[in-house]
């Protein structure tokens, strides 16, 4: 039976870099953020999101993800309602995706909010990617071109690393990407041999 390995970490921790590296090792990786963005292009989903937030969130009949982020990260109730539209669809898509890899020993599900969404319960093992808070803030400001305040707002909606560590099987500290990738290789080797 294929093991589902959860890969998570706070915004700016470098989990996407680690996910790419794991994929280069021949392990299929499901990136929940990418699939969630695809789901946001489905007409029925667009209609539900517009019903929730109004037509101001549209840009040429597509959902403006920056406008959504600005709304949901300021209001926990809006975030909860938004997630209730998106998460069940991502969950179903993942269930179908993983079926094509039933002959493999493991697959990885990369999700920023693996714990917060409760989907960690569906994973056999969990890898947490961490980095110092200040490093994470600087990475996201540079990557997304957003203010420090915007990054801190997003962080406020994620569990802190200590809480995540308590539920994780492996922790990769991503201060030095080369060392973090080596840690990922070692963890994948262990998981393949379990």
Task: For each feature predicted by the language model, list its residue ranges.
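ATP-dependent NMP and nucleoside kinases share a basic, alpha-helical "lid"
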Residues: 93-101, 106-143
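Hydrophobic "anchor" residues on beta-strands that sit immediately upstream
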Residues: 4, 29, 105-106, 165, ...
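Walker A (P-loop) phosphate-binding motif
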Residues: 1-27, 31-34
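A general structural signal for well-ordered alpha-helical segments in protein cores
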Residues: 4, 19, 32, 42, ...
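Well-ordered beta-strand positions
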Residues: 28, 34, 125, 169-170
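Short gly/ser/thr-rich secondary-structure transition/capping motifs
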Residues: 88-92, 107-112, 152-157
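ATP-dependent small-molecule kinase phosphotransfer cores
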Residues: 34, 38-105
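Small-molecule kinase domains that catalyze NTP-dependent phosphoryl transfer to phosphate-bearing small molecules
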Residues: 121-122, 133, 142, 146-190
């Amino acid at each position: 039976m294929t093991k589902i390995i959860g890969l998570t970490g706070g915004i700016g921790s470098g989990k996407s870099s680690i996910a790419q590296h794991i994929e280069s090792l021949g392990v299929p990786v499901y990136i929940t953020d990418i699939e969630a963005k695809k789901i946001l292009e489905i007409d029925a989903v667009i209609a539900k999101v517009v019903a929730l937030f109004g037509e101001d969130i549209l840009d040429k009949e597509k959902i403006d993800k920056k406008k959504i982020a600005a709304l949901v990260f300021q209001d926990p109730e809006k975030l909860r309602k938004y997630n209730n539209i998106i998460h069940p669809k991502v969950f179903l898509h993942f269930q179908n995706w993983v079926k094509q890899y039933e002959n493999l020993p493991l697959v990885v599900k990369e999700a920023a909010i693996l714990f917060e969404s409760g989907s960690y319960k569906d994973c056999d093992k969990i890898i947490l990617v961490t980095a110092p808070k200040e490093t994470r803030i600087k990475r996201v400001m540079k990557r997304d071109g957003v203010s420090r305040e915007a990054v801190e707002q997003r962080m406020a909606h994620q569990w802190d690393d200590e809480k995540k560590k308590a539920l994780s099987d492996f922790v990769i500290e991503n201060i030095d990407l080369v060392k973090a990738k080596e840690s990922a290789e070692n963890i994948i080797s262990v998981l393949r041999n379990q």
